[in-house]
Design a protein with these regions (language model features):
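Non-catalytic accessory segments of DNA primases and related replication-initiation nucleases
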Residues: 1-104, 108, 113, 127
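Structured, non-catalytic alpha/beta "coupling" segments that mediate domain-domain communication
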Residues: 2-15, 127-146, 271, 281
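Residue-level signature of catalytic and energy-coupling elements of molecular machines
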Residues: 67, 199, 269
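A polyampholytic, Gly/Pro-enriched intrinsically disordered region
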Residues: 101, 228-236, 276-281
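Arginine/glycine-rich "motif VI" loop of SF2 helicases in the C-terminal RecA-like domain
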Residues: 222, 249-256
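C-terminal or mid-to-C-terminal helical accessory/interaction module adjacent to the motor/catalytic core
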Residues: 255-281
Length: 281
């Protein structure tokens, strides 16, 4: 039973291949340790949010009620690791501390935010949670949607940039979609988290979305690893049309084949999928 480096050395020796090995610098080792620590903390948070959704009164009454209203079935909620963060300034912090997680990493991942006078608060409190996975399935960040009407709070909060989370390089749903994108040789690109989950549930699994940002060249490049065909389905309102135009300007110069689905004004992909199923595409 070989480790990966040992297997490489074994194969190289068997076939007389010269294998050049370099020693990792101390800086690279520390960087890798930090990344691993952030992945571990994000994994803890994902499990905490999921457990809160399924096993707390507030999670069931508020978080699960919202997902059920959207028509999300339990299997799709579990598949995307959806969760809920209770309306508390420090519930996640207390749980993390009780389990021995380093506060520094909670802050670096953006799960906890340091405010005035050194006070620390749970960043996603009172929100349903959409974990963001990288292509290998590791949780790199989160999106959180507020459910109560509060004009002072943004509708969505997203994890800040970190050593493991670079918004311009990642797409929501890519881990669950990558195989289907390859199989169908086509990728559906929508605007938001709920669009991805809703259409995935409707049977369109080759679907992704930017993570709270405008589409970037690096995200287009990520899709192109799996297919050269994109179908764009952005919201039918004025902002959605503007985003569509910008996305077209981003995609076509990359030499990718592009189709655009025009939704009726006031509809997003999630709304339209719930009314019409996946057949509209």
């Amino acid at each position: 039973q070989f480790s990966y480096p040992e297997a490489l050395r074994f194969i190289a020796k068997r076939y007389n291949i010269e294998l050049e090995e370099t020693q990792e610098t101390a800086e690279a080792v520390e960087e890798k340790k930090l990344e691993d620590s952030l992945y571990i903390v994000n994994q803890f948070a994902k499990e905490y949010f999921s457990n809160t959704l399924f096993n707390s009164t507030e999670g069931q009454n508020i978080g699960m009620s919202y997902f059920k209203e959207r028509g999300f079935r339990e299997n799709i909620i579990q598949k995307f690791d959806l969760g809920y963060s209770i309306e508390s300034t420090d519930a996640l912090q207390k749980e993390a501390k009780a389990k021995g997680y380093n506060e520094e990493y909670l802050i670096k991942t953006g799960l906890v935010k340091q405010v005035d006078n050194g006070i620390k608060r749970d960043f996603f409190r009172g929100r349903v949670i959409f974990p963001v996975h990288n292509v290998s399935g590791k949780v790199v960040g989160f999106g959180g949607r507020i459910l109560k009407k509060d004009e002072k709070q943004p509708k969505y909060l997203n994890s800040p940039e970190s050593e493991v989370y670079h918004k311009s390089k990642i797409l929501y749903g890519i881990f669950h979609a990558r195989q289907s994108i390859r199989t169908h040789d086509e990728c559906f690109l929508v605007e938001g988290y709920t669009d991805v989950v809703s259409l995935h549930q409707a049977g369109i699994e080759n679907i992704v979305a930017p993570c709270g940002t405008a589409l970037t060249e690096l995200q287009v490049k990520l899709i192109s690893r799996y297919t050269n065909n994109i179908v764009l389905i952005f919201d039918g309102d004025h902002a959605g049309i503007n985003a569509t135009i910008k996305a077209i300007d981003m995609i076509l110069p990359a030499g990718i084949n592009l189709k655009v689905v025009l939704l009726p004004n006031g509809n997003d992909a999630d709304d339209f999928a719930r009314k019409n199923g996946g057949s509209f595409v």
